[in-house]
Amino acid sequence: MAKEIKFSEDARQSMLRGVDQLANAVKVTIGPKGRNVVLDKEYGAPLITNDGVTIAKEIELEDPYENMGAKLVQEVANKTNEIAGDGTTTATVLAQAMIQEGLKNVTSGANPVGLRKGIDKAVTEAVKSLHEQSQKVENKNEIAQVGAISAADEEIGQYISEAMDKVGNDGVISIEESNGFNTELEVVEGMQFDRGYQSPYMVTDSEKMEADLERPYILVTDKKISSFQDILPLLEQIVQSNRPILIIADEVEGDALTNIVLNRMRGTFTAVAVKAPGFGDRRKSMLEDIAILTGAQFITDDLGYDLKDATVDMLGTANKVEVTKDNTTIVNGDGDKNSIDARVTQLKSQIEETNSDFDREKLQERLAKLTGGVAVIKVGAASETELKERKLRIEDALNSTRAAVGEGIVAGGGTALVNVYKQVSEIEAEGDVETGINIVLKALEAPVRQIAENAGLEGSIIVEKLKHAEPGIGYNAATDEWVNMLDAGIVDPTKVTRSALQNAASVAAMFLTTEAVVAKLPEENNDAGGPAMGGMSGMM
């Protein structure tokens, strides 16, 4: 496969065209008066959304060099989404601004390495300033404000606030599709731990890459399962009941794992294996918690139990189990209420008695998992298209709210980024490093500028007025007013704003220091090649 290489200015300009195409499609969605983007789907109705990362993921460009540029900015959106769960459009706008301004300076002869140093210095100072501005989220009302701003819907903010109030800030909140028109909040008891399936072939929903088990049996053991023969007698009993099984063990490997996957693919039975949560003695305690919650007998050498002798009666059960790549959630375990209450009392006593902050924290986590619930926001809408769009907005709002609880909030609407301008501009530097700092300074204005332009205003006028306003005072594009953003409830999670800036700067610096780009040459179509072979004319 032949490949083509482009160098320096030619390479960067080709990639810039891709950056601009993706960023221009994404940035029309930013702000309260941002527009939607319609995405063509291979199956089903088109998706209408204003979610930056969803739009970015759909963009594939024909030119390989332009596509590489688009993929770089796509990475900014993906990374920001992974870390903060929101702010992907802001990150895209910042990345485009830094790349465009940086490229002008590289073309004028600036050293990309010097620019990178300046960008890094400026971002470090900006993040420091953001943390200084940050305020803690202290009540239910503030949580609702964060959710409402992210989703551009006060009702969604209220649902998220109520859900977090019922299951705690660290509780499990899942988002499901409702069969009706209305969105509802439902709280069900459940336990979640950070271990996922041991093989992707165990999933029951290949689109979401998760395994949903209805009324499963649950095997709880601290043993390592290597031989399929050890669990075969138990699985034979389960096959007759036609119910799925969740296997929680120290590890399922070798012959056992292979046969579980093969039988799952053949449709013989549905089994999902996950590693036991925790480590050392804490692992054993957490397995005991799961056994009590589900009504299982904990199969361990300490109690003299052997896997080969296990029966269905020793298994726990639950109403539902959801397993993803990273997490397992057990909903409505069928454990004895008195046993669960006794375990809760025991944990509370241990929390009071321990002198270790670390142990206390871990005990509180276990208590929360044993007593806490799973809040389910059931999303309703009049059409499938609206349902998908609304679900995406709620997911973003939930992520944004969690981020706010973790690191606090700053003034929204891009105001916080402009508020760090003064502190960043005071960094002492010279030459290309100073130019790198100026690249970031100009980029800090970009989100506010774009929000204003999406509202039909001249962005530069709003930016200049904001630079001279008191810190915290910003432009409310929804009402066309200048207000105290925090008092008005127009806030952004510090984590979202910080992540967007850091990820945008990282990709911009990589872009500017790129000197060569390698891409495959398009294959020539030789179907209409030579003449037909003698004596075979007319044959296909």
Swiss-Prot record:
GO terms for molecular function: ATP binding; ATP-dependent protein folding chaperone; isomerase activity; unfolded protein binding. Its main location: cytoplasm. It is found in: Cytoplasm. One of its GO terms (biological process) is protein refolding. Pfam families: Cpn60_TCP1. Keywords: ATP-binding, Chaperone, Cytoplasm, Isomerase, Nucleotide-binding. GO terms for cellular component: cytoplasm. It catalyses: ATP + H2O + a folded polypeptide = ADP + phosphate + an unfolded polypeptide. Its EC number is 5.6.1.7. Together with its co-chaperonin GroES, plays an essential role in assisting protein folding. The GroEL-GroES system forms a nano-cage that allows encapsulation of the non-native substrate proteins and provides a physical environment optimized to promote and accelerate protein folding. Belongs to the chaperonin (HSP60) family. Forms a cylinder of 14 subunits composed of two heptameric rings stacked back-to-back. Interacts with the co-chaperonin GroES. This is Chaperonin GroEL. The gene is groEL.
